[in-house]
């Protein structure tokens, strides 16, 4: 008998045992997590728009509750966490303004939540009254500091960290929120958003002095910051994040989302530890499921799991569903009022509108310009021809397969913020800066990527940030036949844009600082609904308003091919 063969089964059993059975003295924790749910209380279509075919719909709090309860019954040590941005995104938030978030998160018995930037969309009062005072779970952020009269008003309503008993152990949860929130939302002047890493370290140190040796950083700053926290903050064992809608998955993904990496994503900290980092995409489509094994000293021994797709194979809990239906009565007028029809898919997904021209962006910009038609001078066909719109302001697609019907509820999911479309005057040089800002960190799914109307722009992403706009043409107004001319740096142009951008949102500080005139306009949803009602049937296309130069597209692929070729040559000649 071959000795090597005899040893193989024993070796295999030992390896399997290491995976399937915890090490002696080890303690297991199951972390269930959501992020960026954005008011998707009801089940949605696969693209997170309004549910059309119930047999193919996903998510929703009733289905989430079913899965959470199944796991709680099967496993002993379970935490349910949310990494922020429950607020904003559908007619639910428009009507209930956050009360629905507190009610249904309480019903699901969340253990903790981190504050996201959108929790401040209705100001601090819109956070305090409906959510902070009503939540039966701790709401966390270590890097938000209140000052002035607000400090006493909000004291104790949110915390930097919380120690939670889980089985016979304790787990520390420390929260964080994007320091860019003042540029993304409306927190006011009495909240200071500190650097996440600088603010987190002393709070983690406090937890260590309390003999808490299992610490989760729960927050809303995006995947890049999540990874930095895992690397830089000493004592953090796990990072549960949000904000960037990052989809991580190990193996073949169950739906159309493309993984940005394996789940969990492992970061090696500066002190040599392996720190798992997770997110669960967005819109309640998935429930993050992470198993962590700790040793007696609180060190992570192993971590594994995957997001669970909440598809129709998971039944909706009847009691939660009944509660949803009861709350929904108040929304019915919004869902039955037909504005018009679309005969094409209106792509308002973040995967499109934050990366390239999307036809939803074209529709909205066309509506904005149409709303400003003023033929007052024979020299001008119109007083304004240009629109810019941050892709992050487009929050949902609309499916044409529901008879193409567009309702107020559909539009409220696309434009949930209740802003206005304003008219400003800018120099060409300011517009050029704005378009450079649009792609200065392209590829990170950030909201500043601009959708346009009356503008043709070409980017070269192989060039350094700040020098990526290679062509920028604008539609003339002083002309009888509109055509595109190169942007002139010293000329003053009229542009229609969201008031969010006029006020410097999404980092467009150059617009706020350099605008020459600012006139407030009509509410965004009214502008688009009026346009759709006027047109009756719409079919916006992708028209080449935004292009990327050949070098931009080929740059990364060419480098990869070049390196691969050299690798082959190296191997052949060894």
Swiss-Prot record:
The record marks 118, 121 as: Transition state stabilizer. It is found in: Cell membrane. Its cofactor is Zn(2+). CDD domains: MPP_CD73_N. It catalyses: a ribonucleoside 5'-phosphate + H2O = a ribonucleoside + phosphate; a 2'-deoxyribonucleoside 5'-phosphate + H2O = a 2'-deoxyribonucleoside + phosphate; dTMP + H2O = thymidine + phosphate; CMP + H2O = cytidine + phosphate. Catalyzes the hydrolysis of nucleotide monophosphates, releasing inorganic phosphate and the corresponding nucleoside, with AMP being the preferred substrate. Shows a preference for ribonucleotide monophosphates over their equivalent deoxyribose forms. Other substrates include IMP, UMP, GMP, CMP, dAMP, dCMP, dTMP, NAD and NMN. GO terms for biological process: adenosine biosynthetic process; ADP catabolic process; AMP catabolic process; ATP metabolic process; calcium ion homeostasis; DNA metabolic process; inhibition of non-skeletal tissue mineralization; leukocyte cell-cell adhesion. Changing residue 358 to Y: In CALJA; absence from the plasma-membrane; exhibits no catalytic AMPase activity. PROSITE patterns: 5_NUCLEOTIDASE_1, 5_NUCLEOTIDASE_2. The gene is NT5E. Belongs to the 5'-nucleotidase family. It is linked to Calcification of joints and arteries: A condition characterized by adult-onset calcification of the lower extremity arteries, including the iliac, femoral and tibial arteries, and hand and foot capsule joints. Age of onset has been reported as early as the second decade of life, usually involving intense joint pain or calcification in the hands. It comes from the Eukaryota. Disulfide bonds join 51-57, 353-358, 365-387, 476-479. Zn(2+) 2 binds at residues 36, 85, 117, 220, 243. Residues 550-574 form a propeptide. Gene3D superfamilies: 3.60.21.10, 5'-Nucleotidase, C-terminal domain. A lipid is attached at residue 549 (GPI-anchor amidated serine). It is a lipid-anchor; GPI-anchor. Inhibited by adenosine 5'-(alpha,beta-methylene)-diphosphate (AMPCP). IMP binds at residues 354, 390, 395, 417, 500, 506. Its EC number is 3.1.3.35, 3.1.3.5, 3.1.3.89, 3.1.3.91. This is 5'-nucleotidase.
């Amino acid at each position: 008998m071959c000795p090597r063969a005899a040893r193989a089964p024993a070796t295999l059993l030992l390896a399997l045992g290491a995976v399937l059975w915890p090490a002696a003295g080890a303690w297991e924790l199951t972390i269930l997590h959501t992020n960026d749910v954005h008011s998707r209380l009801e089940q949605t279509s696969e693209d997170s728009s309004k549910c059309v075919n119930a047999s193919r719909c996903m998510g929703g709090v009733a289905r989430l509750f079913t899965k959470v309860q199944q796991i709680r019954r099967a496993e002993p040590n379970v935490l349910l966490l949310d990494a922020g941005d429950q607020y904003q995104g559908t007619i639910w938030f428009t009507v209930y303004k956050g009360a629905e978030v507190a009610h249904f998160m309480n019903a699901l018995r969340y253990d903790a939540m981190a504050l996201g930037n959108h929790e401040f969309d209705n100001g601090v009062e819109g956070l305090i009254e409906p959510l902070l005072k009503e939540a039966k779970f701790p709401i966390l952020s270590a890097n938000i500091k209140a000052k002035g009269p607000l400090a006493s008003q909000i004291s104790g309503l949110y915390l930097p960290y919380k120690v939670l008993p889980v089985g016979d152990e304790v787990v520390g949860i420390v929260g964080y929120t994007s320091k860019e929130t003042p540029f993304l939302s409306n927190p006011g002047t009495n909240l200071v958003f500190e650097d996440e890493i600088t603010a987190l370290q002393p709070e983690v140190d406090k937890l260590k002095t309390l003999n808490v040796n299992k610490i989760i950083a729960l927050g809303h700053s995006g995947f890049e910051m999540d990874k930095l926290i895992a690397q830089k903050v000493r004592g953090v064992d796990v990072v549960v994040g949000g904000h960037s809608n990052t989809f991580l998955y190990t193996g073949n993904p169950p739906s159309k989302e493309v993984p940005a990496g394996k789940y969990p994503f492992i970061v090696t900290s500066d002190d040599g530890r392996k720190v798992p980092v997770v997110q669960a995409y967005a819109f309640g489509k998935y429930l993050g499921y992470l198993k962590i094994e700790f040793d007696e000293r609180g060190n992570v021994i192993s971590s594994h799991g995957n997001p669970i797709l909440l598809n129709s194979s998971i039944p909706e809990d009847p009691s939660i569903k009944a509660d949803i239906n009861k709350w929904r009565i108040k929304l019915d007028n919004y869902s039955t009022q037909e504005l018009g029809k679309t005969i094409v898919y209106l792509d308002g997904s973040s995967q499109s509108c934050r990366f390239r021209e999307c036809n939803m962006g074209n529709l909205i910009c066309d509506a904005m310009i149409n709303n400003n038609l003023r033929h007052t001078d024979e020299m001008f066909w119109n007083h304004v021809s240009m629109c810019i719109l941050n892709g992050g302001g487009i929050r949902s697609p609309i499916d044409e397969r529901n008879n193409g019907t567009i309702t107020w509820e559909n539009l409220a999911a696309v434009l949930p913020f209740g802003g206005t479309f304003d008219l400003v005057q800018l120099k060409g040089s300011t517009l050029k800066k704005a378009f450079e800002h649009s792609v200065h960190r392209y590829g990170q799914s950030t909201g500043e990527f601009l959708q346009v109307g009356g503008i043709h722009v070409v980017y070269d992403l192989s060039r350094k940030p700040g020098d990526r706009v290679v062509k920028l043409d604008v539609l003339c107004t002083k002309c009888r036949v509109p055509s595109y001319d190169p942007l002139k740096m010293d000329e003053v142009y009229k542009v229609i844009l969201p008031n969010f951008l006029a006020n410097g949102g999404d980092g467009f500080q150059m617009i706020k600082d350099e605008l020459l005139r600012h006139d407030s306009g009509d509410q965004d949803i009214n502008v688009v609904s009026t346009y759709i009602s006027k047109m009756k049937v719409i079919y916006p296309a992708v028209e080449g308003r935004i292009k990327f130069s050949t070098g931009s597209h080929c740059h990364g692929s060419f480098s990869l091919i070049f390196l691969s070729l050299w690798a082959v040559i190296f191997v052949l000649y060894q």
